[in-house]
Amino acid sequence: MKNKLLFKIFLSLSLALSVYSINDKIIEVSNTSLAADVKNFTDLDEATKWGNKLIKQAKYSSDDKIALYEYTKDSSKINGPLRLAGGDINKLDSTTQDKVRRLDSSISKSTTPESVYVYRLLNLDYLTSIVGFTNEDLYKLQQTNNGQYDENLVRKLNNVMNSRIYREDGYSSTQLVSGAAVGGRPIELRLELPKGTKAAYLNSKDLTAYYGQQEVLLPRGTEYAVGSVELSNDKKKIIITAIVFKK
């Protein structure tokens, strides 16, 4: 527990100093796959009970519910402009700005009561934004052996991503249970949310157009530091483990 706390302290300091520098000793600590003191849901019923407490905490207004529901119908209408604007809402049209502010307000109404893992399924295009992992590397990675990914390329991916900080200018849709949503995306981004992280649990029919996906929506501009990149046991999934900076 002491080492994990030390890891989090160094990550927080690194955000202010540099997006690339984290002490080598801390990197070694970060290579654990799942921390024992972080909630990790595998049962849908338990996840739903936990998530419903966040909904109760939020006390959403009717306008909040409409904003969240409309977002889930087509998140690209909000996230697309946000990403093009580099997260600067002043560059958006007034209508989109209003929607963003409403979403910001809605998400801020509930926070995680404890540290918890959430998951985001990604396709390989995600790796095009990773500095140090070339287009040639990506092409080679796509040439799987019966669906199994090359260990050496994943090891290189770990080397270039480990201890680096990444930012999502849009909102981040995640799942409370691994694999709860539609599969087919070979990258699993496993995010640790520290206690007190702003997050909206949307698995309610009046909050999402896709009930059953166990969606947890994170604020726009979410930043996370990568601790490890590794293959699943069957080598068919690339697992990126990271910790989110609490907003």
From Swiss-Prot:
Residues 39-247 form the TR mART core domain. The active site is at residues 120, 173, 215. This is Epidermal cell differentiation inhibitor. PROSITE patterns: TR_MART. Its EC number is 2.4.2.-. Inhibits terminal differentiation of cultured mouse keratinocytes. In culture, also inhibits the differentiation of human keratinocytes. Probable ADP-ribosyltransferase. Keywords: Glycosyltransferase, NAD, Nucleotidyltransferase, Signal, Transferase. GO terms for cellular component: extracellular region. Residues 1-35 form the signal peptide. GO terms for molecular function: NAD+-protein mono-ADP-ribosyltransferase activity; nucleotidyltransferase activity. To ADP-ribosyltransferase C3 of Clostridium. It holds the Pfam family ADPrib_exo_Tox.
